[in-house]
């Protein structure tokens, strides 16, 4: 439920949000919110609906029941896609383009003005010197870092991160936490799914636990 003591509406809120597949419930109904400067850590066993929840919020799946609000107003599917940056299990990269070409291509594709230059984003995620490397030549961990660079370039205030620590070593996990912290300090927010014990983004973090449907 939305806290009535909030002086401003949450950045994102869900009311009685639920989703079913083949008439079988996947999650919900759920009521939750996330404020600017806050991370919501979504936990649950495999099959609890963590990935599905993020895909519904991102507008990749239809809202079957319930309501999604942005800044206190009901959000249409197109509104959500502009407001949120989604990082899923698949990096969504062009294998035959270089790392730098991928970042330029994706920024142009979405009509977004990057908050930093793509080359700087590569350096931030530890891929300096890989500007001309083709994506198909990268390891799984390097591809995840490139996807993180794309996320960093997005001006979207809300990050939806599905298992962002997967395929990363301890250095990469620390990188993700630093990125989340910087995003929150800048007034953004994040929803992060994980089942890893090590995955604990810093700063303001609350928990949402999903139970697998019976």
UniProtKB/Swiss-Prot annotation:
Presence of the UniProt keyword Membrane in the record: yes
Source superkingdom: Bacteria
Pfam families to which the protein is assigned, alphabetical: ABC_tran
InterPro entries in the record: AAA+_ATPase, ABC_transporter-like_ATP-bd, ABC_transporter-like_CS, ABC_transptr_haem_export_CcmA, P-loop_NTPase
Keyword Transmembrane helix: no
Annotated residues for binding of ATP: 44-51
Compartmental location: Cell inner membrane
Stretches assigned to the ABC transporter domain: 12-214
EC code: 7.6.2.5
Catalysis performed (reactions): heme b(in) + ATP + H2O = heme b(out) + ADP + phosphate + H(+)
GO cellular component: plasma membrane
Any one Gene Ontology BP term: cytochrome complex assembly
Its job: Part of the ABC transporter complex CcmAB involved in the biogenesis of c-type cytochromes; once thought to export heme, this seems not to be the case, but its exact role is uncertain. Responsible for energy coupling to the transport system.
Family from the record: Belongs to the ABC transporter superfamily. CcmA exporter (TC 3.A.1.107) family.
Subunit structure comment from the entry: The complex is composed of two ATP-binding proteins (CcmA) and two transmembrane proteins (CcmB).
Name of the protein described by the UniProt record: Cytochrome c biogenesis ATP-binding export protein CcmA
């Amino acid at each position: 439920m939305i806290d009535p003591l909030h002086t401003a509406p949450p950045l994102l809120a869900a009311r009685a949000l639920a989703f079913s597949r083949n008439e079988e419930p996947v999650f919900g109904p759920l009521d939750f919110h996330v404020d600017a400067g806050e991370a919501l850590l979504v936990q649950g066993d495999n099959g609890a609906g963590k990935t599905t929840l993020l895909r519904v919020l991102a507008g990749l799946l239809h809202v079957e029941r319930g309501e999604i609000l942005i800044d206190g107003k009901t959000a249409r599917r197109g509104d959500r896609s502009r407001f949120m940056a989604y990082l899923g299990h698949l990096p969504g990269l062009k294998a035959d383009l270089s790392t730098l070409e991928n970042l330029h291509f994706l920024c142009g594709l979405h009509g977004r003005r990057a908050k930093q230059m793509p080359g700087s984003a590569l350096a931030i995620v530890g891929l300096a010197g890989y500007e001309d490397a083709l994506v198909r030549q990268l390891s799984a961990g390097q591809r995840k870092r490139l996807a993180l660079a794309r996320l960093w370039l997005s001006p979207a205030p809300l990050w939806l991160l599905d298992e962002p620590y997967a395929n990363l070593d301890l250095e990469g996990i620390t990188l993700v936490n630093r990125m989340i912290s910087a995003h929150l300090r800048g007034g953004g927010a994040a929803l992060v799914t994980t089942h890893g014990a090590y995955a604990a983004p810093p700063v303001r973090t609350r928990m949402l636990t999903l139970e697998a449907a019976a």
